[in-house]
Amino acid sequence: MDPWEGWPYARAYLLLVAVAFLVVGGQVYLFHLRAAFRAKSMYGPVLLAPAIAVAGVVGAVTREGAIGWTVLVIFAIGLVEGLIGTVLHLRGIAARIGGFTVRNLTAGPPPLLPFAFGALGLTGALAVMWDAW
């Protein structure tokens, strides 16, 4: 990947994504703490969010060579983690008595938070690839 000149939109956006991952990661931590980390899979997004935030800052500074590809892979892992979390949360809501009722959607695992996590990973990856060709 080529070096970036100046501070184009994609670089500034990567910094915004890094901050967003810290905020969303904090919210994920609080929800999983409320659920007492019952499943080992709950540790994934909690540990991954700060790592992705660091990758976002590194990606905003440079995307040359292996660094750019590593940042891209880390954001892709965030996307996959978000998709897995969305499936797990929807399965958790469906398993509750009453299934997909408004009460279960509000009291159970948040159905949209993992999707937001994955969407941030996707937009971060797109920002890394911005003008790379």
PLM feature spans:
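Short, strongly hydrophobic alpha-helical membrane anchors
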Residues: 1-8, 133
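Transmembrane alpha-helix entry/boundary detector in multi-pass membrane proteins
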Residues: 5-13, 29-49
